[in-house]
Amino acid sequence: MKFFIDTANIDEIKEAVKMGMADGVTTNPSLIAKESGDFETIIKNICDVVDGPVSAEVISLKTAGMVKEAKQLATLHENIVIKIPMTVDGLKAVRMLADQGIRTNVTLVFSPLQALMAAKAGATYVSPFVGRLDDLASDGMVLVEQIIDIYDNYAIDTEIIVASIRNPLHVLDAALMGADVATIPFGVLKKLAAHPLTDRGIDAFLNDWKKAKK
């Protein structure tokens, strides 16, 4: 399973790259707004650091505007993937962009039928938001499982990016289910590497070493 980093913070991305954990990056307008600098510069800087897909989201809600923005974004770097919202206008934009060879990531997916429609429109990636479903007392990972089943039924090659990840369990479940990608906030990524028994083991080794050197 590929690890994408869900952030626009260049320092977090660089740390993830050093760990070998940044197969790609996903951004959105909210993440971009947290950083200093203009949108295009931030995206270019991310592309310079990461050797993998970088999702940049359009702001327009109408098909023509989405396509216009997407074409401009696609000129910034060859690794750019255009994030398109899961709407009727978004599906039209995805179809048009796919015909022009521009990769897309359909975002804000909350049902398996939305994911199927995105794939049929020609999406390169689809992003089910598991954490937001969990917030509504639903099980977001059930959605991922359903999408995987549907895609497997029809040999659909659209990749599934498990998004809105809130904790390590989401990542574990995504891996066990066979999702293509988990896009992970940097704070959650660090938690994946941690375990109390690892810390206790290190402390024990160091204490034993100190005793042996006396």
From Swiss-Prot:
- Provide the transmembrane region boundaries: none
Please give the superkingdom of this protein's source: Bacteria
Q: What is its EC number?
A: 2.2.1.2
Its GO biological process terms? carbohydrate metabolic process; pentose-phosphate shunt
**GO MF terms, alphabetically ordered:** aldehyde-lyase activity; transaldolase activity
Return the GO cellular component terms, semicolon-separated: cytoplasm
Pathway per its UniProt entry is: Carbohydrate degradation; pentose phosphate pathway; D-glyceraldehyde 3-phosphate and beta-D-fructose 6-phosphate from D-ribose 5-phosphate and D-xylulose 5-phosphate (non-oxidative stage): step 2/3
Its recorded reaction(s) are: D-sedoheptulose 7-phosphate + D-glyceraldehyde 3-phosphate = D-erythrose 4-phosphate + beta-D-fructose 6-phosphate
Keywords per UniProt: Cytoplasm, Pentose shunt, Schiff base, Transferase
Q: Quote the Pfam families the UniProt record gives.
A: TAL_FSA (PF00923)
Q: Where in the cell is it found?
A: Cytoplasm
Q: Where is the active site?
A: 83 (schiff-base intermediate with substrate)
Q: Return the similarity comment.
A: Belongs to the transaldolase family. Type 3B subfamily.
- What's this protein's function? Transaldolase is important for the balance of metabolites in the pentose-phosphate pathway.
Name the HAMAP family for this protein: Transaldolase_3b
Name of the protein in its database record? Probable transaldolase
Q: What is the lineage of its organism?
A: Bacteria, Pseudomonadati, Thermodesulfobacteriota, Desulfobacteria, Desulfobacterales
